[in-house]
Amino acid sequence: MSSKKAKTKTTKKRPQRATSNVFAMFDQSQIQEFKEAFNMIDQNRDGFIDKEDLHDMLASLGKNPTDAYLDAMMNEAPGRINFTMFLTMFGEKLNGTDPEDVIRNAFACFDEEATGTIQEDYLRELLTTMGDRFTDEEVDELYREAPIDKKGNFNYIEFTRILKHGAKDKDD
């Protein structure tokens, strides 16, 4: 063994992957159970869940899913479903939150200039007058830790990242 292979804490070459947080959401026994479930669904054992795997698994349960139903299930993933993606999707379902892009796109509907921000007064008006209306106190609570710049722009891209992955450590 060469000394170059010794662990050092000075290198910061590997960026953190967005999906790495999903493994922290579950303990080792839960991850093992998810792995067993994944392997049961992955009928052809290629390391990915595809439409045929879903069909075969549902058929084994006495179901006869339509192509449209299977397509809708497959379209919930942004790409091929490997174990990490499977775990991420389950984590989002169990956490009760929408995927990051769905949340970001909901905010983007009100960002006419595609700046990644919404004026905080305008967002307050939207939140208190449309859909499931927030109270002013709830909006105040939301804004307390929200990324709002000095010009009053609510950065919904950063807010969505914080919502899904937690706040960055700051030296406040």
From Swiss-Prot:
Modified residues (Phosphoserine): S20
GO terms of molecular function: calcium ion binding; GTPase binding; myosin heavy chain binding
Organism of this sequence: Rattus norvegicus (Rat)
Cystine connections: none
Residues reported in the UniProt entry to bind Ca(2+): D42, N44, D46, D53
Biased composition (Basic residues): 1-16
Name of protein: Myosin regulatory light chain 12B
Note: This chain binds calcium.
Signal peptide feature range: none
